[in-house]
Amino acid sequence: MIIKFGYYDDEDFGLTAFPEIKFSEKEITKNNKKNGHLEKKKAEYTKYLITGIMEDFPDVEIIDIFLPQLEKVEAGKMQETVWDGQAFQHKINKEKVEFEHTIFGICEEYPLWECKFEEYRKVFEGWKKFLKMEVDLKSEVAVEI
């Protein structure tokens, strides 16, 4: 799965960051018989992982506040850390990251969802790299997870 951050030109708000998810030919071929599997995966990763990172870490300064905690978990100096964001609570340990909706909690519309720590870390770093770039239609960062 490839997650790409880029900009589009919104007539009301100007250049606006947006994510795009693509799958490799290998993933498409492998999942060809599993009807809807990739679309479901794309929807879940967009709803939780990408939205969680984009909404809860809107600028580099906030990322830099949280990054030392993430690094401590990765190095094994901390068992777990939690980030209470505007969209989600991110409960992070070395194996996985759980997302619980900040306002609605665990509910039918937003069940508890998780991804691998490595996936979270890669998207988090890609988002930081993207935010450091010039705001331009040509600016983009692709992350493979």
Predicted feature residues:
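Ser/Thr- (and often Asn-) enriched beta-sheet segments in non-cytosolic proteins
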Residues: 2-7, 20-22, 89-91, 96-98, ...
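A general marker of short, structured functional hotspots
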Residues: 3-4, 41-44, 62, 116, ...
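Short, well-structured hydrophobic secondary-structure segments
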Residues: 29-75
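Amphipathic protein-protein interaction modules
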Residues: 68-128
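Short, highly charged C-terminal tails/helix-capping segments
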Residues: 133-145
